[in-house]
Amino acid sequence: NRILDQVRTDYLMLIMPGQAIEPGQRAVERLLSVIDESGAGMVYSDFKDSVEGSLSDHPLIDYQPGSIRDTFDLGSMALLSMRAVRRAVKEYGAPREGLKWAAFYDLRLKLSLDSVILRIPEPLYTRIPTDRRASGERQFDYVDPRQRDYQIEMEEVATDHLKRSGAWLEPDFHPLPRAEGPFPVRASVIIPVRNRERTIKDAVLSALSQEASFDFNLIVVDNHSTDRTTEILSALASEDRRLIHLIPGRKDLGIGGCWNEAVFSDCCGEFAVQLDSDDLYAHNRVLERVIETFEERRYAMVIGSYTIVNFDLQEIPPGLIDHKEWTRENGRNNALRINGLGAPRAFYVPVLRQTALPNVSYGEDYSVALRISRYYEIGRIYESVYYARRWEGNSDAALPLATANRYDAYKDHLRTVEIAARKRMNHELGTENN
C-alpha cells in the first residue's frame, strides 16, 4: 500500500521478486504503447529464457476471467495503469494490512474485476530462470505442508474475490437424486488405457484383489492399443468374469470419452471409482473404504489421498498428497484457485450421468468435479489409498512448455465457465428469494 501511495506517474512497472531480466529492444516503449492504446489495467508479455548462454522463446498464456489461481504466470515484468489501480482500490479497497504474500495477488484480482489484464504475445525481455524444476514437480507446491500459512492466506484472498464477483457459494448442498436402478453391481472400477503393456496387468490385479462386502466389477476401456495391452487384457478377462474389456467403437476418444463409455454402459455400477492404467490401490480394502465414505453423508463424489512413488513403488517427493486444505465450508470455492482436487476420484453414477466428462485427456476430472461441487457435497479421505507412479512413460512427469501452457489455459477456461455458472446460479437464487 505504501508503494501505491507514493506513485505519482501514470504507470507502474513491476519486476517480480528474485528475477534477473534484461529488457529487449524498446520493450518499455512497447508496453507503454499497448497499455495506453488498449486501456488495459495491466499488461504483461512473453519473454526469452537464457540458460547457459542459449536463448529460447517462453510464451505465456492469455488472462481469462477464470485465471484466478495465485500461480498464474505473468512472467517477470508487468506494467500497471495507476488510473485503473486507483479505481480498483477505491471500489474494492486496498490490499489489507498484514498480508505477507498475497498483496499483489489481491490487487491483481481486484484489478481484473473492471479492467482488462492483457498479454502481449511478443518476447519483450530475457529472463534467467531461477526455478528449473519440471512441471510435474511444481504442480504440487500448493499441497506442501511447509506452505500451509501461505496457502491459507491465498485462499482467503481468493474467497474474498469470489464473494465480490458473486461467484462464492455457501455450504448449502442439493440432495442427491434417486438411483436409476437396478445396477448390476454396487461399484465399478474404471481404467481407461492405451498402450500400457508394462503396467496394465498390475493395475488390473490391484483392482481385482479388492476385498469388499458388496459386488463390484472392473471396466477397462481399451482405447485401441497398438502394443500388447489388448492381448494382456483379453487373457485376464478370460480368467475373471469381473473384468469387462471394452473397446470403443469410436477412435476419437480421450480419457474423458473413455470414462463416458464405461459410465454410460449397462455394466456400470452405482459408484464409479478411478484407477489409472499405471497406478495401484494402496491396499485391498480401498473400495470398501470409498463406499463407506459415500454412505457417511450421501456424497456425490469422494476423493481420496495418494502417495507418489517410482516404478518400483518406492515413495518419492513430495510423497503424500492429501489435500488437507479442503474444508466443507469453503472447499468448493477454493477448488477454483488450485489446479487439482486429488485422487482417486469416485462418483455416484446417477449424478455423473447427468454431467458426463469432456472428451479430453487433461482436466476432464477437474471439469466434472467443479460442476458436481456446484450443486453437491464432495467427501474426502485423508489417508493414502492410492499409489501414483512417476516413471519415464508417465504423461505427468515433465511436460514441455507448450503442453503445460495448453493445459493451464484449458483449466483457466474451465474456471471461467464455472465462475459464470455460479454467478448465474447465485443471481437466480437471489431473484427467487426477493
Question: Which role does the model predict for each range below?
Answer:
Residues 97-107, 361-368:
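Acidic donor-binding loop at a coil-to-helix junction in glycosyltransferase catalytic cores
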Residues 20, 25-57, 285-318:
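Conserved donor NDP-sugar-binding/catalytic core segment of glycosyltransferases
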